[in-house]
Amino acid sequence: MYTIEINFKSYSMFHPCVASFESAKNLAENYATFSGAGAVVVKNDRTGKIEYTIEQ
């Protein structure tokens, strides 16, 4: 499972429980288009490691 964290200027949003890395990556790319979104991070829940990052 993967969790996506979307960082805005003054707060963060989370999208937990994404089943596959491919789905998480696609969702992260969509979230990166949100107005005001800064960094979007995909984290592997099992290992705790960051698997994918988009910084703007």
What are the residue ranges of the model-derived segments?
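Surface-exposed loop/edge segments in extracytoplasmic proteins
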Residues: 11-17, 48-53
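Intrinsic disorder/low-complexity segments, especially N-terminal tails and targeting/processing regions
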Residues: 6-8, 20, 52, 56
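Short, mixed-charge low-complexity intrinsically disordered segments
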Residues: 33-56
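A short, charged, amphipathic alpha-helix used as a generic interaction element across diverse proteins
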Residues: 18-40
